[in-house]
Amino acid sequence: MATFSQKPTEVVKKWVIIDAENLVLGRLAAFVANRLRGKHKATFTPHVDDGDNVIVINADKIALTGKKYTDKKYYWHTGYIGGIKERTARQLLEGRFPERVVEKAVERMIPRGPLGRRQLKNLRVYAGSQHPHEAQQPESLDVGALNRKNKRIA
């Protein structure tokens, strides 16, 4: 029997919604990254985008363990000499776009390259509980119930 290799025309993508309230950031990001890549499917093929469309709501209510809320730093470079910048997770979560913490965590768990960029476009993260994807009828997934370590009650 030959090894199964899925073709891009055979891919069936589902819509999944995840409520991130009180979920641990790294555990949520790992789960979402696997869903985006399609590794949860028996038809997983490394060079084909067969992952699901994932919607994450309440990204501003994510939980960080230990002292990461105040100590974790996000770095970027402006492109100018000496232009390294940093912000803490607290500054990002209390700032204008708190959903970027979840986006960055998932982005860094997906392989870099053209396929990874295409898979990352299937991720939609919203700070609040409202989202414009009701027409897709997303299936709700309770990540907190999968493992007791996935959820933190603050």
Swiss-Prot record:
Superkingdom field: Bacteria
GO molecular function per UniProt: mRNA binding; structural constituent of ribosome
Pfam families: Ribosomal_L13
Keyword annotations: Ribonucleoprotein, Ribosomal protein
Database matches in InterPro entries: Ribosomal_uL13, Ribosomal_uL13_bac-type, Ribosomal_uL13_sf
Function: This protein is one of the early assembly proteins of the 50S ribosomal subunit, although it is not seen to bind rRNA by itself. It is important during the early stages of 50S assembly.
Subunit architecture: Part of the 50S ribosomal subunit.
Name of protein: Large ribosomal subunit protein uL13
